Amino acid sequence: MNEEYDVIVLGTGLTECILSGIMSVNGKKVLHMDRNPYYGGESASITPLEDLYKRYKIPGSPPESMGRGRDWNVDLIPKFLMANGQLVKMLLYTEVTRYLDFKVTEGSFVYKGGKIYKVPSTEAEALASSLMGLFEKRRFRKFLVYVANFDEKDPRTFEGIDPKKTTMRDVYKKFDLGQDVIDFTGHALALYRTDDYLDQPCYETINRIKLYSESLARYGKSPYLYPLYGLGELPQGFARLSAIYGGTYMLNKPIEEIIVQNGKVIGVKSEGEIARCKQLICDPSYVKDRVEKVGQVIRVICILSHPIKNTNDANSCQIIIPQNQVNRKSDIYVCMISFAHNVAAQGKYIAIVSTTVETKEPEKEIRPALELLEPIEQKFVSISDLLVPKDLGTESLIFISRTYDATTHFETTCDDIKNIYKRMTGSEFDFEEMKRKKNDIYGED
């Protein structure tokens, strides 16, 4: 432990493990520690089920009907991977995919007027969908064709829209789309949590809809993937990558002090020993005085013995409740997975509800989502602070990740990873570069 490292990483959340893997591949000497005895930090999957009961201080042990505790791997943070998104690219380029198995989520649903409807995943489904009327469908189709053909590098595809100036609100007007379709597009396809995006330049939204369509095109049922045995497999996959490249891992390591001299980090003290470093990466829990709270997220893990009604008995799905439908500023999400993903006992389903907290009574805010899940066998409620670093870390060389937000995919997490990478190295994160470095070491073409 009394050694000199290029980078020390504290916490084994997904952000930390990916950065640790990338830094190791880049030839840096990395020491990675976590005070917990398990991988994953805030984004861990908890097993056995008994540990989940203890964690949420639920008295007694799980009833017999829950099956064997070891058959459960319950995510603390509900997220899916966009099939064509940044995290999948990171997994492919680093070949961490060899440690993981994925399943396509069976469907995405959207809540409207108290009922849930399937988000169409084919042209035929779109035509048959009762989400919108016939004329609306034609206009919507025209809009989707425009988005599909849109190419940032080819102004001929802009059709009079300036992607850096025209707002999304004006683009919707141009295609004469009604409020329901706008809600559906912004929240179920572009996956925005609020309506702030309407007055922003439209290129970001167009790219998000493209990401959704391209992800959907890869597998057909939905744009989302989920790893067998739970999301806790992801940080472990990147930890393995780091280890292959000489990274050192230590779990169950109490961190006594982050040592700072003249405003810069020089090392970490643990169990009386000091490991020195040039840069430090950590999650907010290790540096409470260097982060600030910008909001809260409520998450409720629900154990069910039945698929969710009106989802065609799907054993995995996502439900989006757009904020307009329930008089809120931000959407409510439901992520559902089940025994089919080796995360629950046979015949059991796990549905996790999440949203950004807006009132003094967060549990009331998510009632519309819980009503869709009835009857619920057991609930585990958590309210977490959203923490962000107070500064960029370029002075102290302490680079702090953000806590996981209420979105149900990893795109914002990947943005944070790329952002920290740039702050640490001064250069943009380049997927292709990553691939070349790996091939140099493995000797592949």
Curated annotation (Swiss-Prot):
<keyword id="KW-0007">Acetylation</keyword>
<dbReference type="GO" id="GO:1902018">
    <property type="term" value="P:negative regulation of cilium assembly"/>
</dbReference>
<dbReference type="InterPro" id="IPR018203">
    <property type="entry name" value="GDP_dissociation_inhibitor"/>
</dbReference>
<dbReference type="GO" id="GO:0016192">
    <property type="term" value="P:vesicle-mediated transport"/>
</dbReference>
<dbReference type="GO" id="GO:0005794">
    <property type="term" value="C:Golgi apparatus"/>
</dbReference>
<keyword id="KW-0963">Cytoplasm</keyword>
<dbReference type="GO" id="GO:1903565">
    <property type="term" value="P:negative regulation of protein localization to cilium"/>
</dbReference>
<feature type="modified residue" description="N6-acetyllysine">
    <location>
        <position position="269"/>
    </location>
</feature>
<keyword id="KW-0333">Golgi apparatus</keyword>
<feature type="modified residue" description="N6-acetyllysine">
    <location>
        <position position="112"/>
    </location>
</feature>
<feature type="modified residue" description="N6-succinyllysine">
    <location>
        <position position="57"/>
    </location>
</feature>
<feature type="modified residue" description="Phosphoserine">
    <location>
        <position position="130"/>
    </location>
</feature>
<dbReference type="Pfam" id="PF00996">
    <property type="entry name" value="GDI"/>
</dbReference>
<feature type="modified residue" description="N-acetylmethionine">
    <location>
        <position position="1"/>
    </location>
</feature>
<protein>
    <recommendedName>
        <fullName>Rab GDP dissociation inhibitor beta</fullName>
    </recommendedName>
</protein>
<feature type="modified residue" description="Phosphoserine">
    <location>
        <position position="382"/>
    </location>
</feature>
<dbReference type="GO" id="GO:0015031">
    <property type="term" value="P:protein transport"/>
</dbReference>
<dbReference type="InterPro" id="IPR036188">
    <property type="entry name" value="FAD/NAD-bd_sf"/>
</dbReference>
<comment type="function">
    <text>GDP-dissociation inhibitor preventing the GDP to GTP exchange of most Rab proteins. By keeping these small GTPases in their inactive GDP-bound form regulates intracellular membrane trafficking. Negatively regulates protein transport to the cilium and ciliogenesis through the inhibition of RAB8A.</text>
</comment>
<comment type="similarity">
    <text>Belongs to the Rab GDI family.</text>
</comment>
<dbReference type="GO" id="GO:0007264">
    <property type="term" value="P:small GTPase-mediated signal transduction"/>
</dbReference>
<comment type="subunit">
    <text>Interacts with RHOH. Interacts with the GDP-bound inactive forms of RAB3A, RAB3B, RAB3C, RAB5A, RAB5B, RAB5C, RAB8A, RAB8B, RAB10, RAB12, RAB35, and RAB43; binds RAB3D to a lesser extent. Interacts with DZIP1; this interaction negatively regulates the interaction of GDI2 with GDP-bound RAB8A.</text>
</comment>
<dbReference type="GO" id="GO:0005096">
    <property type="term" value="F:GTPase activator activity"/>
</dbReference>
<keyword id="KW-0597">Phosphoprotein</keyword>
<keyword id="KW-0343">GTPase activation</keyword>
<dbReference type="GO" id="GO:0016020">
    <property type="term" value="C:membrane"/>
</dbReference>
<dbReference type="InterPro" id="IPR000806">
    <property type="entry name" value="RabGDI"/>
</dbReference>
<dbReference type="GO" id="GO:0005093">
    <property type="term" value="F:Rab GDP-dissociation inhibitor activity"/>
</dbReference>
<keyword id="KW-0472">Membrane</keyword>
